Amino acid sequence: MAGSEPTGLAPDDDRHLGAVLALAERSRREGHHPFAAAVVGADGRLLAEAMNDSRRDRTAHAEMNALRAAAEQHGEAALAGATLSSSAEPCAMCAGGAYWAGIGRVVYALSETSLLALTGSDPENPTLALPCREVFSRGQRPVAVIGPLREDEARRAHLGFWKEPSQPDLSQT
């Protein structure tokens, strides 16, 4: 595998991403949207993990839940330079949350473009065509982004979950 790893991939990134993908499958089995995320400290220690829970609160995305849990359990300082590992590319809201939480790196599996191909215009998952790299590029400090990784594996949690709507037209964005 040496030489084939994306630039910036830390030794434990793949292991943490695998755990997040398994948690996304569990999220689906428990009746939530099939997303999960984890916050990993700069020392490689798992600080928090979370599933999507947006049935009553559409902002309760896995990334936001993991960021909040990590801050509550370990203090805000623990998030400085930490890695957000996510089953899918963080949306604009979650990218903003990661930025303001002090996250230094984002590692994700399924790209926003691939997710959109799976969800189409399903009202359960309205998509903003705004990659997290673009959100982070507008900030005053850098956030490294690594992904997509393991997309085929990440896609499995979504297959058959979303309705079969027509694809939205994002050409005007």
Language-model features and meaning:
Residues 20, 24-27, 37, 48, ...:
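Small-residue (primarily alanine) positions within well-ordered alpha-helices
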Residues 35-44:
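Short beta-strand scaffold segments in enzyme catalytic cores
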Residues 51, 60-63, 74, 80:
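Signature of N-terminal electron-transfer/Fe-S-associated modules in redox systems
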Residues 76-89:
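Immediate flanking context of iron-sulfur cluster ligation sites
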